[in-house]
Amino acid sequence: MKKLISILFSLMLPLSFTSASKAGGHMEAEVIHWWTSGGEQAAISKFAEAWEDMGNTWIDTAITGGDNARGTTVNRIIGGNPPTAAQFNISKQFVDLVEQGQLQSLEEVASAEGWRDFIYPPDLIETCEYNGEFYCVPVNIHSSQWMWVNIDVFEKVGVPIPNTIQEFVDVAPKIQEAGYIPLALGGQTWQESLMFGVVASSTLGFPHMAKLYRDKDVDAFRDGKFELTLHTYRDLNRFIDEGAPGRLWNDATAMVVEGKAAVQIMGDWARGEFAVAGKEAKVDYDCVIPGNVKYVSLGGDVFVFPKNSDPKVKDIQLQMASMMVNPTVQADFNNAKGSLPMRLDVDTSAADACMQMGLDLIKQPEAIMRESDDWNSPAFTNAWDDIISEFRNDPNYSV
């Protein structure tokens, strides 16, 4: 059966990139990533299964934490022992590696398969292109703009599910009085910054956000709406439990899944945790993009392929890149991950109600919101995140 699946799968791949597999035979690939939660492991296994169904071996190197995984990749490259592929975010995180000539160009497979014709939205091409060549594979679109809601908690308390951050602030005291934690948070810097971004986009809208993150417009910072955003963000502290510091994001999601907490503000990767727990969208949990104007932020993940002294590795890397953008694999992976596929010709019939919301929005160019990582260096992003974290945790930090 496995041999048959391998043959059928190979037929779905472009002809120009099935020949390398046949000529090279069995291919072994080590992949570094940071997908370690239950939902994330279910998703990465879709890539691994597709690779192994082609008759190859997938060596899984999962490292907890994006910073740790990226650091390991860079150290391995510098040390002369690079992995076959490694995960990064849709961002400028890997630009230095491209400029230093450390990454394999994927232009050969990108041109042969017409990536520029099907990758959507086109902004993703901009992320991966350098001097007219592809150096990464975008595998999904993740949006940070979500509130995840335990429906049963809201029904028991007798308050409506909020549509905006302010509406949540209005009902949170009653949730607290009923003995539930209103807002589940993992008190890590990146989670705090993500929550601030959701509060800001809900309060300010994307045009104002672009003035802040892209243009560094001083007037946008001095605007009264930005001050309101800061006050609202800090006000959420009243509804977060004392166990938040250091909590992992998926542990915070579990609090909502289990009915200990009412809401989590987190990216759509949280959907994978609900799915693994057997929960159904709009039945057991709800998903809300807070704000009167709905945006879907353009985040997500890419894989890069470090250069290797062994010339055979390039063939393996091009095969893997091709596999990752295959429409069937894209459907399986993103349905498990909670993310949106990076092409529109994917079968989304299995999409749940929350995924469908994202699919509807991503087709509207005016609803797509670029993230800070797209415009700023990792150094700027880290400094910004640290300031936001200090502001949330230090009551003496004035607006």
Predicted regions and their residues:
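Extracytoplasmic "Venus flytrap"/periplasmic binding protein-like
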Residues: G24, A29, K46, A50-P122, ...
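Extracytoplasmic/periplasmic solute-binding protein
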Residues: Y130-V139, Q145, V169-V218, A261
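Conserved C-terminal helix/tail region of periplasmic/extracytoplasmic solute-binding proteins
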Residues: G25-M27, I78, E155, L361-V399
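Extracytoplasmic/periplasmic substrate-recognition and gating elements
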Residues: G25, E49, M54, G79, ...
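Hinge/lid segment of periplasmic solute-binding proteins
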Residues: S91-Q145, V169, M195-G197, K282-D286, ...
